[in-house]
């Protein structure tokens, strides 16, 4: 079991459920816009939100946002240690830094002292795209071993000043590298791990890479908090994270939708119907399985374990529960009737 840290009112590691995070894409100086996005993230199921703090103007905006945020906030800091101190003093619930890029040890100690005093954990964020030149020369390129060595160097720097309230991330845009790095680190250390694939590309590729990388580790019991990085609305990152956790058997809340791939027997717009069901139920937290099947020949039987579902006919369909037919309706009435029954479950 990993160590446990507390980010605001959220526990990470130590046997706590895997925590979902995302990062805002608003300007931190846009207080109103940032708060609106944080509220949308919370509605979607996000538990911790991270914001970029690139300068003192952003640090002032971060302070205002902290005062009204419904979620614990992480300040993402690079290069300037004074920004980390300002964020810690402004109400940050966690600081994300790379100790190697904020200056000499005296500056690292200054950040550590403030975080220790205010009981604010630090995430050491190691990234394949920003490894120290010395490690790149040693390993030739950003290997898993290079990421892990960098992580331990940074951890040792925090520990030198008596700071142990930390978590680690070792991210790469290459899935096997990220997975191997996290496995290697976990075999040697019990600090909690923040896992994710970075710079994943277009949304479709990003979803696949994230599901493979994060999912592989979760199935091995590795990973205490996750962020799905997508070139998209951050809210979509949260929905993807929830789906990954559900697929890995680590999340019971929320609807599990199963549907057939369609074939020549399909006589309804199954693809459109599945998308409508998915959209309508995306914020439903009921732990149920909903089936949307293309035909009545195999639909109810194949989806016998579903709590409720639809099987399509030729311009009509039927609603079934646990494989048993409940109601036969015209196609246009299927979705409203299904949602009404789900509401009563």
Model-derived features: positions:
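N-terminal amphipathic alpha-helix/helix-capping segment at the start of soluble metabolic enzymes
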Residues: 1-23, 116, 279
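Hydrophobic faces of well-ordered beta-strands that scaffold small-molecule active sites
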Residues: 18-24, 49-51, 73-77, 95-97, ...
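Catalytic alpha/beta core domains of metabolic enzymes, predominantly
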Residues: 127, 135-282
């Amino acid at each position: 079991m990993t160590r446990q840290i507390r980010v605001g009112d959220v526990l990470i590691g130590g046997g706590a459920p895997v925590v979902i995070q995302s990062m805002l894409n608003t300007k931190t100086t846009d207080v109103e816009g940032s708060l609106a996005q944080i509220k949308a993230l919370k509605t979607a199921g996000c538990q911790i939100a991270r914001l970029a703090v690139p300068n003192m103007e952003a640090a002032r905006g971060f302070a205002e946002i902290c005062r009204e945020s419904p979620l614990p906030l992480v300040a993402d800091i690079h290069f300037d240690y004074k920004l980390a101190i300002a964020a810690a003093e402004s109400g940050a619930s966690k600081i994300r830094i790379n100790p190697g890029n904020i200056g000499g040890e005296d500056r690292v100690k200054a950040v550590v002292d403030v975080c220790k005093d205010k009981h604010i954990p630090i995430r050491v964020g190691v990234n394949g795209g920003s490894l120290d030149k010395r490690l790149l020369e040693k390993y030739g390129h950003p290997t898993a071993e290079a990421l892990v060595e960098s992580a331990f160097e940074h951890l040792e720097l925090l520990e030198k000043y008596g700071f142990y309230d930390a978590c680690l991330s070792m991210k790469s845009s290459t899935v096997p590298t990220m997975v191997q790095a996290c496995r290697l680190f976990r075999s040697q250390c019990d600090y909690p791990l923040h896992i994710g694939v970075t710079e994943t590309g277009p949304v479709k590729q990003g979803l696949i890479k994230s599901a493979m990388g994060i999912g592989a580790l979760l199935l091995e019991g590795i990973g205490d908090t996750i962020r799905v990085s997508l070139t998209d609305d951050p809210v979509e990152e949260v929905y993807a994270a929830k789906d990954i956790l559900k697929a890995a058997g680590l999340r019971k809340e929320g609807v599990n939708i199963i549907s057939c791939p369609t074939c020549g027997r399909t006589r309804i717009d199954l693809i459109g119907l599945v998308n409508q069901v998915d959209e309508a139920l995306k914020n439903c937290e009921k732990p149920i399985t909903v089936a949307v099947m293309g035909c009545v020949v195999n639909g109810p039987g194949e989806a016998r374990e579903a709590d409720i579902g639809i099987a399509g006919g030729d311009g009509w369909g039927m609603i079934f529960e646990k494989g048993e037919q409940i109601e036969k309706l015209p196609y246009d009435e299927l979705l409203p009737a299904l949602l009404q029954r789900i509401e009563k479950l």
